[in-house]
Amino acid sequence: MNRRVALAALVSIALLGAYVHAQFGNQPAKLDTIKIKDDLFVIHNDFVPGNTTVLVTNEGVVLVDDKFEIDHENIMAQLKKITNQPVKYVINTHYHADHSGGNPKLQGLGAQVITSQQAREKMAEIKQPGMTNVTLDNSLRLFIGGKRIEMYRFGRAHTDGDIVVLFPDHRVLAAGDMFTFGDATPQLIDYAGGGSARDWTGTLDGALKLEFDQVVPGHGLVTTKQEMRKFRDSTLTLRTKVHDMIAGKKTKAEIEKMLRTDFKFADLHIQRSLDGLMLELQ
């Protein structure tokens, strides 16, 4: 990557973060807590920011994603409803601020942050507060309070640093934005962050080989492995349609209309994904 391309990518990453924060991170989200198991919960909200998964142990709490910084106090209030244990670890499924913005305040309370190496590099590029303390390449296991948590990176999808977090004793997967569900948000390929429409399907195939029944999506309500399979199929349909339209000499405007109609792309998705899709799938 030459210096000009690298600079353009860096600016794009920063602009995406600024856009999302300006649109959704300027006031705290209304949160509620959903119980999955006796010791496993989701702090949920509508649309943005992302879901926060909570594992409670007798040695402390593990969070998967921690929303925007402005949501910190509300997250802590939700945690106090279910436990007095401190937060020991925060696992970010990727670098975006609606999943990692709470890192600095939680680190100030003693928590350690875990991400993929790729996510840490993106955080460093944009000088994002709350940098990672521990990174993983392909997998990592965490043992706390007699419970096991497994983290995996299967490849590029929403970004190049996406990881999934498996709670094997509960057969629950926290998928991050590799999988979003319902009307929460359609597939967003963050090309500036290393995302890939071509690789996304195979990355999901890797995650789907894990043993789980329920899924916490990056955005949307807790759902099933079958719904994640359906989402996987939709990623294949999307890239096939775009590729075929490019091969058929369809215009950019025609492809945009198809994405808005068939895949519920909003302005953000068009701005962040359309040019990259056309370049990657030509």
Regions found by a protein language model. Give the residues of each.
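Metallo-beta-lactamase
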Residues: 28-31, 35-36, 60-62, 67-70, 117-161, 168-169, ...
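Solvent-exposed loop/turn segments at secondary-structure junctions
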Residues: 48-50, 61-63, 68-71, 95-100, ...
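Bacterial N-terminal signal peptides that target proteins for export
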Residues: 1-10
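Accessory terminal helices/loops
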Residues: 13-24, 208-211, 222-282
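Active-site metal-binding motif and surrounding structural segment of the metallo-beta-lactamase
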Residues: 33, 57-62, 70-112, 210
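Divalent metal-coordination and catalytic microenvironments
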Residues: 39, 55, 65, 79, ...
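Conserved beta-strand hairpin/beta-sheet module of binuclear metal-dependent hydrolase folds
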Residues: 32-78, 163-167, 172-177
